[in-house]
Amino acid sequence: MIPKKIHYCWFGRGEKPKLAKKCIASWKKYCPDYEIIEWNEDNFDINTNEYTKWCYENKKYAFLSDYVRLLVVYRHGGIYFDTDVELIRNPDFLLENQAFFGFECSEYVNTGVGFGAESENTAVNQMIDEYLPFLDGKNGVIGCPKLNTEALVKLGLIRDGSYQEFPWGTVYPKEYFN
C-alpha cells in the first residue's frame, strides 16, 4: 500500500507564488492525515550526481524536480505533486495500487500531475534508470514525460491513453488528473 505522504519539490529558495500556496492548501484540506514533505536544497543533496548539480547551478529547477521526485518516491514511497496541482478530492482510493501514474495525453505519462508508489517500486526504478545517460551532466536535459513514458513502455505500457493494470502498478487515463 502506498503510504500517506505527499512529496513536492521547491528548489531555489524563492517565495512560492499564490497558485503554489493555493494548491498546497488543497492538499492539506483533502489529505489532513498525510505527511506533506517539501524537498529542497536543505534536505536533498544537490551534488547527488553531475545532472542534479548542473540543473541546480543553472537554475533548471523543473528538470531537477523531474529527477528528484523519482528518487524520493522510490526511497520513501508516497505521492508526488507539482506545486501547480490542486486537489478537488481525497486521493485515498489510489493508495491501494503498488504504483499509479496518469496519462497527460494519449501518448505520454506525466509524473508532475501526480503519481504515487510504494517504496522500491519496479516502475519508478525503471524511470530512474532512464536518466542514466544524463547523470554525467554532459547530455543536457529532457522532459520527464518522454523519459517516464519510455520506462513504462519497456514494462508493457501501450501508448493509447487508456486505463492499464500491471503487476507493478496502474496507469490511469488523463481524465483522472485533469
Q: What kind of region is each of these model predictions?
A:
Residues 67-78:
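Small-residue hinge/turn detector
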